[in-house]
């Protein structure tokens, strides 16, 4: 005989009914996430090439407190939208997007780099500063996207090429990209100009 399932704990029940404090989207909450980000981020000069300052989010994601604040900050912003799916961009967008999707109770769609998925796929090519790249998502109706509202999440907005291509990819598949969220923006590269007709949320500015 299969044993009966234990009763759901009060703590588990409580987590389903979030308080107004959990949903707080005040400037103070946003500053807390940005502050935690600045305390943990690893700054690497001259990487990947001389003159470039690389801001590595790995220590931020590895620290449970900082990661929690970051995810809650992004999730609280997402609550302003009617979202069916979070689109996480390859690769750190997978980590952030999955956690945000879990927080919101929605699914996660991995937007993969070209060549990582079996056919059939929706595919888009886009230009980089020194070449081209591609993105893909499944195209066999395993993930119905027609009319779905998708919010895209990535770690950094630089030139805007990857986010712009991701939007094109999803819209070609019938989805509606309703907004974008990133942890850092390199404002000097003017990436937001390529995305100016979409709501964009940035946790903090790079540099």
Swiss-Prot record:
Q: What is its EC number?
A: 2.4.2.7
Q: Where do transmembrane segments lie in this chain?
A: none
Report keywords, A-Z: Cytoplasm, Glycosyltransferase, Purine salvage, Transferase
Compartments reported by the entry: Cytoplasm
The biological process GO terms on file are: adenine salvage; AMP salvage; purine ribonucleoside salvage
The record's region (Disordered) falls at 1-33
UniProt GO molecular function: adenine binding; adenine phosphoribosyltransferase activity; AMP binding
Presence of keyword Calcium: no
- Coarsely, its chief localization is cytoplasm
Recorded GO cellular component terms are: cytoplasm
Reactions performed catalytically: AMP + diphosphate = 5-phospho-alpha-D-ribose 1-diphosphate + adenine
Check the record and name the InterPro entries matching this protein.
Ade_phspho_trans, PRibTrfase_dom, PRTase-like, UPRTase/APRTase
SUPFAM superfamilies found in the cross-reference section: PRTase-like
User: Which Gene3D superfamilies did the record assign?
Assistant: 3.40.50.2020
Instruction: State the pathway, as annotated in the record.
Output: Purine metabolism; AMP biosynthesis via salvage pathway; AMP from adenine: step 1/1
Q: How does it assemble?
A: Homodimer.
What family is this protein classified in?
A: Belongs to the purine/pyrimidine phosphoribosyltransferase family.
Q: Which PANTHER family match?
A: ADENINE PHOSPHORIBOSYLTRANSFERASE
Role description: Catalyzes a salvage reaction resulting in the formation of AMP, that is energically less costly than de novo synthesis.
Query: Know the name of this protein?
Result: Adenine phosphoribosyltransferase
Recorded source organism is Corynebacterium jeikeium (strain K411)
Gene that this polypeptide is encoded by: apt
């Amino acid at each position: 005989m299969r044993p009966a399932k234990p009763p759901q704990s009060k703590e588990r029940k409580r987590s389903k009914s979030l308080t107004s404090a959990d949903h707080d989207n005040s400037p103070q909450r946003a500053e807390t996430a940005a502050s935690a980000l600045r305390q943990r981020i690893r700054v690497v000069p001259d990487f990947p090439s001389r003159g470039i300052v690389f801001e590595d989010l790995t220590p931020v994601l590895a620290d449970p407190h900082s990661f929690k604040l970051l995810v809650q900050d992004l999730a609280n912003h997402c609550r302003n939208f009617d979202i069916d799916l979070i689109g996480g961009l390859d690769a750190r967008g997978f980590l952030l997007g999955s956690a945000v999707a879990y927080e919101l109770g929605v699914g996660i769609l991995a937007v993969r780099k070209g060549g990582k998925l079996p056919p059939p796929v929706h595919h888009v090519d886009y230009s980089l500063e020194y070449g081209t790249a591609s993105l893909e998502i499944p195209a066999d109706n395993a993930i119905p996207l027609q009319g779905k509202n998708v919010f895209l999440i990535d770690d950094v907005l630089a030139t805007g090429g990857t986010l712009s291509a991701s939007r094109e990819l999803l819209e070609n598949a019938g989805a509606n990209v309703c907004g974008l969220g990133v942890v850092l923006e390199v404002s000097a590269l003017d990436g937001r100009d390529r995305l100016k007709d979409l709501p964009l949320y940035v946790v903090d500015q790079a540099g």
